[in-house]
């Protein structure tokens, strides 16, 4: 079973700039560990986990990559692919939108 990265400095990542060099090294190391697993083992990594996403700009490739990765790891994903279809567009704060999404 894959071990959680205990020293990871962030819970929420908004930008690559949010990550330290140590964080990136942990991610690369964990990626290598996952790549050595067979498909059945990989599907257990995110079983029971859900990824929520909110894109403020259209980003088909990135969104599909996130969705595909979660599916391959056994998890699910949901989100808003374009902020113009969210309540942020109607004046709801980003914090409120994130709070609502985190409940799922």
Annotated model-derived regions:
Residues 50-104:
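Active-site cofactor/substrate anionic-group-binding motifs, chiefly glycine-
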């Amino acid at each position: 079973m894959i071990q959680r990265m205990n020293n990871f400095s962030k819970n929420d990542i908004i930008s690559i700039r949010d990550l330290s060099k140590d964080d990136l090294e942990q991610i690369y190391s964990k990626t290598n560990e996952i790549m050595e697993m067979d498909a059945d083992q990989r599907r257990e990594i995110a079983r029971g986990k859900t990824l929520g996403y909110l894109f403020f700009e259209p980003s088909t490739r990135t969104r599909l990559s996130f969705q595909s990765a979660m599916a391959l790891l056994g998890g699910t994903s949901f989100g808003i692919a374009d902020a113009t279809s969210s309540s942020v567009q109607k004046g709801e704060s980003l914090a409120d939108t994130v709070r609502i999404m985190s409940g799922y």
